Amino acid sequence: MGLEAVIDEITEKGRKEAEAIRKESETEVAQVLAAANVKSDQIKTAVDEDVARQEARIINQEVSAANLLVKRSQLNAEKSLLDQVYAAVLLEVRGASPDFHRAALSSLLQQARAEIGEGMIHASARDLPMVQTLLKEGSYPGFVAGSPVDIDGGIIAESRDGLLQVDYSYRTFLDRVWESGLKNASDILFG
């Protein structure tokens, strides 16, 4: 074998080894790229899912905030309307006929007599003359008319020693009725 044949054989062997190394490298590169693509797809999918979750959470928060704002506005409007109804009822009671006030005051005096027995009866400046008349006409011994007080109607009964005061004012009765019937009134007005 000549030197040229040895050189050709070595060259051929080197070329084959280089080709094998190149093919092995290409296979390795293809595997690394495939793994990188899989990992990249996994990361992209995870990011997309996270973005979708964050978007849904933000939308839910915004919807909840908007619903709360609407509910608050609705409740404020309902409260305003209920306050107007309360004021209208109180105005209507204040403006009732003298016969109504006389009957109401007579009934309240009977309640005061049953609860405290004797004492002083205070009333609004409008009702005080009627209270004085009822005290003189009725069977209310031990009760005297007191000074006028700032109430819409009704009476304030005070024991003789001043330790007990019972509020029979129209506003107090209206407040009791209002508190006990507020849910029903709200249901009727606002469904």
Swiss-Prot record:
Q: Name one GO molecular function term.
A: proton-transporting ATPase activity, rotational mechanism
Q: Which GO terms describe its biological process?
A: proton motive force-driven plasma membrane ATP synthesis
The UniProt entry's coiled-coil ranges are none
Q: Does the keyword Ligase apply?
A: no
Cellular component GO terms held in the UniProt record:
plasma membrane; proton-transporting two-sector ATPase complex, catalytic domain
Q: Which Gene3D superfamilies match?
A: ATP synthase, E subunit, C-terminal (3.30.2320.30), F1F0 ATP synthase subunit B, membrane domain (1.20.5.620)
Q: Which UniProt keywords apply?
A: ATP synthesis, Cell membrane, Hydrogen ion transport, Ion transport, Membrane, Transport
Keyword Membrane annotated: yes
Which InterPro entries has this protein been placed in? Answer: ATPase_E_C (IPR038495), ATPase_V1_Esu (IPR002842)
Concerning Pfam families, the annotation shows: vATP-synt_E
List the membrane topology term(s).
Peripheral membrane protein
* Broad class of the protein's primary localization: membrane
Q: Where in or outside the cell is it found?
A: Cell membrane
Domain of life, per lineage: Archaea
Q: Which proteins does it associate with, and in what oligomeric form? A: Has multiple subunits with at least A(3), B(3), C, D, E, F, H, I and proteolipid K(x).
Q: What does this protein do?
A: Component of the A-type ATP synthase that produces ATP from ADP in the presence of a proton gradient across the membrane.
Q: Which family does it belong to?
A: Belongs to the V-ATPase E subunit family.
Q: What is this protein called?
A: A-type ATP synthase subunit E
Q: Which organism is it from?
A: Methanosphaerula palustris (strain ATCC BAA-1556 / DSM 19958 / E1-9c)
Provide the gene name from the record: atpE
